[in-house]
Amino acid sequence: MVKISFQPAVAGIKGDKADKASASASAPAPAPAAEILLTPAREERPPHHRYKKGSSVGGVCYLSMGMVVLLMGLVFASVYIYRYFFLAQLARDNFFHCGVLYEDSLSSQARTRMELEEDVKIYLEENYERINVPVPQFGGGDPADIIHDFQRGLTAYHDISLDKCYVIELNTTIVLPPRNFWELLMNVKRGTYLPQTYIIQEEMVVTEHVSDKEALGSFIYHLCNGKDTYRLRRRATRRRINKRGAKNCNAIRHFENTFVVETLICGVV
């Protein structure tokens, strides 16, 4: 608080004091000096801005949602590219149209040079192979569809001429696993051609009718569903099949290795 006082003016001439002495004696006493009290003004502070917590939390939420949407877009784009480009290329690499030259040493005639063609589909993830043998140009076997299921350990032959299915345990000494067979065919596709190869023969006998095809697995089930299906047993000892015995046998020539296999199915019903 500041105190300000106002004093009355003092006469500047001494003579006036004497003249006014008498007058001042009779005059009333002068009024006290006027005082004015001034209160210092309060300092004005800038208003304090309070930030709301809700606005910052909302900004974080919007940012998080934006990141989630961006990540989802990247995931869907990756799935699209994988499905329509990578899988398509992989499918093309797993389908093969193959041909192999071999000497037919099983023929009664002199050894002749033969060619065998087949379409191969290899399913690496499902671990099975599917082979289609078209009608041979120069005889030597029936057209057939063959499935080698390495998960079930089974092989199924669908003789297209008879429209019948035959199932037997998978012979892993003859049939290459899907990965090895795929590598072999990829080398052939790249130009590393198979040399002229040879043919071996295996003989099988029909044993019993199969009624429960679902127990054979989904791959063989789809191949043999709606067809008469029979079990086969591999003949342990080789025997020479004459012309009379050959009438009761059907031959399917195929290859899943570096050589050709002739599968004889005998006792066909």
From Swiss-Prot:
Disulfide bonds: 165-224
Glycan attachment sites: 171
Post-translational changes noted in the entry: Type I membrane-bound, as well as soluble, furin has a pre-eminent role in ITM2C proteolytic processing. PCSK7 and PCSK5 may also be involved although to a lesser extent. The soluble form of PCSK7 is incapable of processing ITM2C. Fails to undergo shedding by ADAM10 and intramembrane cleavage by SPPL2B.
Gene Ontology process terms (BP): negative regulation of amyloid precursor protein biosynthetic process; neuron differentiation
Domain named BRICHOS: residues: 138-232
Keywords in alphabetical order: Cell membrane, Cleavage on pair of basic residues, Disulfide bond, Glycoprotein, Lysosome, Membrane, Phosphoprotein, Signal-anchor, Transmembrane, Transmembrane helix
Record PTM Phosphothreonine, positions in chain: 39
UniProt site positions, description: Cleavage: 244-245
Localization: Lysosome membrane; Cell membrane
GO molecular function: amyloid-beta binding
One Pfam family of this chain: BRICHOS
Listed transmembrane segments: 57-77
Record-linked SMART domains: BRICHOS
Domain of life, per lineage: Eukaryota
Annotated GO CC locations: Golgi apparatus; lysosomal membrane; lysosome; plasma membrane
Main location group: membrane
InterPro entries: BRICHOS_dom (IPR007084), ITM2 (IPR040145)
Family: Belongs to the ITM2 family.
Function: Negative regulator of amyloid-beta peptide production. May inhibit the processing of APP by blocking its access to alpha- and beta-secretase. Binding to the beta-secretase-cleaved APP C-terminal fragment is negligible, suggesting that ITM2C is a poor gamma-secretase cleavage inhibitor. May play a role in TNF-induced cell death and neuronal differentiation.
PANTHER family: INTEGRAL MEMBRANE PROTEIN 2C (PTHR10962:SF5), INTEGRAL TRANSMEMBRANE PROTEIN 2 (PTHR10962)
Protein name as catalogued: Integral membrane protein 2C
